[in-house]
Amino acid sequence: MRRVFCVLYMPIMSTAIRLIAGLGNPGPDYETTRHNAGFWLADHLADDLRATFALEKSFFGMVAKARHAGENVLLVKPITYMNRSGQAVGALARFYKLAPEQVLVLHDELDLLPGQVKLKQGGGHAGHNGLKDIQAALGSPNFWRLRIGIGHPRTLGLAQQVADFVLHPPRRDEQTAIDDVIHRCRAVVPAMLDGDFALATRQLHSGNGA
């Protein structure tokens, strides 16, 4: 008796980035504050991708829809304030059936100095309430993060509490360093949209110096 074996080929989900979430707080009072570094980068990426942000209340944020290499790419700036960022990211990921591995979050990072940036996948939230809420909304920590260094008041010699520090604008030299990081991030995001995270990481981290 001959046995017939059937091989089922399951489609492999692309792990290239399809949703970019810039974190920050909405409104003019917060526009220039350190906590809004993710918004700053998201605005530049929308320009690079020739996309325009528009309010989509069902997704709790300003959403921009773009195309890259024939694929759809979404950008979002949540309007729920930092601590509820997961509402927007979770709603978009569910509606468009995106895996956590296809999500890139842009956020400020206290543990990196201005002028430094790191790309990483997974890990904890290190007390960052925006990341904490996104992790809960996605049910996984396996999304990608672009950590934009803003420094810590202690390492920058400032007598400020962290909560106050992140809600103030960077000093001029800090802003210049952050702007340089944003420029470097813009250069490597296309590689992430292509799924080449090794290239993006190598190019991005080489600019951090010793």
Curated annotation (Swiss-Prot):
CDD domains: PTH. Its EC number is 3.1.1.29. The record marks 108 as: Stabilizes the basic form of H active site to accept a proton. One of its GO terms (biological process) is protein quality control for misfolded or incompletely synthesized proteins. The record marks 25 as: Discriminates between blocked and unblocked aminoacyl-tRNA. It catalyses: an N-acyl-L-alpha-aminoacyl-tRNA + H2O = an N-acyl-L-amino acid + a tRNA + H(+). One of its GO terms (molecular function) is peptidyl-tRNA hydrolase activity. It is found in: Cytoplasm. It is an enzyme of class 3 (hydrolase). One of its GO terms (cellular component) is cytoplasm. Its main location: cytoplasm. The active site is at 35 (proton acceptor). It comes from the Bacteria. Keywords: Cytoplasm, Hydrolase, RNA-binding, tRNA-binding. TRNA binds at residues 30, 81, 83, 129. Belongs to the PTH family. Monomer. Hydrolyzes ribosome-free peptidyl-tRNAs (with 1 or more amino acids incorporated), which drop off the ribosome during protein synthesis, or as a result of ribosome stalling. Catalyzes the release of premature peptidyl moieties from peptidyl-tRNA molecules trapped in stalled 50S ribosomal subunits, and thus maintains levels of free tRNAs and 50S ribosomes. This is Peptidyl-tRNA hydrolase. It comes from Bordetella petrii (strain ATCC BAA-461 / DSM 12804 / CCUG 43448). The gene is pth.
